């Protein structure tokens, strides 16, 4: 028994160092700070990381107007790994460093704020199903950022699906059913003729004689 106590005494300092290192490392790794200023390596992927953490059930602080609208995430090893995978610049900061940032943001003269994000919104984009992601700037950006979205069009709107989504993106739609501004230049182009035919077929499918009647109903 005495030998056991002697051995424990010999390793006492080592045990203290190991325990101290464990608690110290956890203390310093409290937040993942994602800057959104010119130093960020991939801004779109950074937005995707913020969205992804919300999907994982975590919260995310959006630091409005602080270094370009940065993000602060709870430190979780999986989150750090995902930043590395997606090529997003980040820093691991302590509670103390985060407190200094929030104090700076809270200054009366600072045009900044902290917005706590708690839920990943369900996103819908109003766009024809025939379009590919790279045909549309919005879907191209969302696809690159790895932010999930659903394409909806007239059929889904008429069915009442809008209530399924938290956020809807509309392009510069006029809902007149006039087939857009390209008529004069492209009315004989194959892709334009196909778009017109698809629009007319869709209107008939939904019980309308004219595309303009369908678009009017969708707008309501």
Place the predicted regions along the sequence by residue.
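Bacterial N-terminal signal peptides that target proteins for export
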Residues: 2-15
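Bacterial N-terminal signal peptides
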Residues: 13-25
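Hydrophobic alpha-helical segments
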Residues: 23, 49-51, 180, 185
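Hydrophobic targeting/anchoring helices
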Residues: 29-137, 145-148
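Helical hinge/lid and interdomain linker segments adjacent to catalytic or ligand-binding clefts
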Residues: 31-32, 37, 41, 76-81, ...
């Amino acid at each position: 028994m005495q030998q056991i106590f002697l051995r424990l005494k010999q390793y006492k300092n080592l045990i203290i160092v190991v325990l101290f290192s464990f608690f110290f490392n956890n203390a310093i790794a409290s937040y993942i700070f994602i800057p959104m200023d010119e130093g960020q390596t991939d801004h779109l992927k950074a937005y995707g990381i913020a969205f992804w953490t919300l999907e994982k059930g975590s919260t995310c602080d959006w630091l409005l107007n602080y270094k370009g609208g940065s993000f602060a995430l709870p430190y979780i090893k999986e989150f750090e790994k995902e930043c590395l995978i997606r090529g997003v610049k980040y820093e691991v900061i302590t509670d103390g460093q985060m407190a200094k940032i929030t104090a700076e943001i809270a200054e009366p003269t600072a045009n900044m704020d902290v917005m706590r994000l708690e839920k990943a919104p369900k996103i819908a984009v109003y766009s024809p199903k025939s379009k590919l992601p790279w045909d549309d700037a919005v879907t191209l950006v969302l696809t690159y950022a790895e932010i999930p979205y659903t394409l909806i069009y007239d059929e889904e709107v008429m069915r009442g699906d809008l209530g399924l989504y938290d956020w809807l993106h509309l392009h510069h739609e006029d809902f007149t059913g006039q087939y857009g501004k390209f008529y004069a230049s492209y009315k004989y182009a194959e892709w334009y003729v196909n778009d017109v035919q698809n629009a007319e077929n869709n209107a008939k499918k939904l019980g309308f004689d004219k595309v303009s009647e369908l678009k009017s109903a969708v707008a309501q």
